[in-house]
Amino acid sequence: DPEERPDELGDLDNQLADQHICNFSVFQSLLDHWALGQLFPIVPIHRLNEEPTLETTLVDITCDSDGKVSKFIDLSDTRDTLRLHEVTNSPYYLGIFLTGAYQDIMGDLHNLFGRVNEVHVFLDEDDERGYYIEETLPGNTVAEVLAMTQYFPNNLAQKMKSQIDQAIKADRLRPQEGMRLLADYERGLKEQTYLSFKTTNGK
């Protein structure tokens, strides 16, 4: 019973709360939560027929100790944990609402993650679904973010190729391995800054 615990154990539930690592940056997408303590509605947007059983907090992928969400909206007050489902091997989706474009503008390039994927959805009573998607905007790629900090992808790829060529000539790397390494490097520059996960069909 929490009421019978000694004072030093009063915060035990929060200290033992699980953590969900989320594929976003608090400083990019929820800057006002970190800076001002503003609270945003956060809820799962799938598995709605399952009861959530884990008391959790959210942490982002920035490796920054402040990149976390540990205060949430409750029915009549606030709470220090959010009840979520246990994570399986499948992606788990949360919705963070009422953020608006202001958060992204303020976040700018914090932690060099850049813009997230964006979808413009409009309500439409004439559409059978009740809404329509006007457009989708992809988030920044690694190459785009690096270019904003004066590290240009073409120069980086040339320097990588030069190092690979030297390693091949010195017999430290096989030519086939070197070409594969260079292809992986150039492909990585074209990918988005946030983690990407292949679906079950490999796409």
Where are these regions (language model features)?
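Charged (often Lys/Glu-rich) extended helix/loop segments that serve as interaction or gating elements
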Residues: D1-K203
